[in-house]
Amino acid sequence: MIEKKSAAEWLQPPATNADSPTPEPSQPNSRKKIPPILTLWKSPRLIAAFWGDFVTATVMVSFDTTLTLFVSHTFQWSSLQGGIIFLALLLPTFLGPLLGMAADKYGARWISAIGILVMIPPLILLRLVNHDSLKQIVLLCALLVIIGLGAAMALTGLYAEYSKICDSIEAEQSGVLGVSGGYAQSYGISEIAWALAGLIGPLVSGKIYAAAGLGTLGWVLSILCFVTVIPTMFFINH
């Protein structure tokens, strides 16, 4: 049996120290967190990747506008033949896994920069295709394959760069891009590049083609690629 006096002593709550500071209720953080999308746009690497993505996409969609018209006028091809020639431009895309291995090994900067450089000579040489002959058809197909290869190289490196940018930002400021790390938003920025290219590219390329032909369009696109190599070399994968 426990006496009432002893039980009262055990049940009595412990005394608090009057001198100990009372914890204050936590105050909400008055500083507003910057949205992850704005944090991404502050990165020079992302801007360089976005520009390279936009230029490469512009090159590709420019052929969507002009190539069918060109082969119809120069080679008197049907719509079916005009569609088939796009295989030359798109077949190098199937090398994507191999190009991805190269990007993982040597870095996105080199694979992207080399890809953009690869597109320049065949774009300039498009002016050599100017009449109907088998040799001219073979030449056009060869030039398109090289352009497609360069575009596949550039895009493979640039797509890898988007995720690496997120990793780099998170390594410096953990949690700044949110729980998911900002990957989806960075890929969304890539989609913006393609949307702008799809909007601007056909308008500009169609205007140039109508005024001066495919050769001049190739020159304009090659200059655009040459300018793009500079930010790619200086900012991608840095």
Predicted regions located by residue number:
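C-terminal ends and interior cores of transmembrane alpha-helices
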Residues: 113, 117-135, 233
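Helix-to-loop junctions at the C-terminal end of transmembrane segments
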Residues: 95-108, 126, 209
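Hydrophobic core of transmembrane alpha-helices in multi-pass small-molecule transporters
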Residues: 54, 136-155, 161
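A membrane-interface helix-boundary motif in multi-pass transporters
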Residues: 203-225
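Intracellular juxtamembrane helix-capping segments at the cytosolic ends
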Residues: 153-177
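Juxtamembrane intracellular "pre-TM" segments in multi-pass secondary transporters
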Residues: 5-50
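Extracytoplasmic gate region of multi-pass secondary transporters
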Residues: 44-87, 92
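A late C-terminal transmembrane helix in Major Facilitator Superfamily
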Residues: 173-211
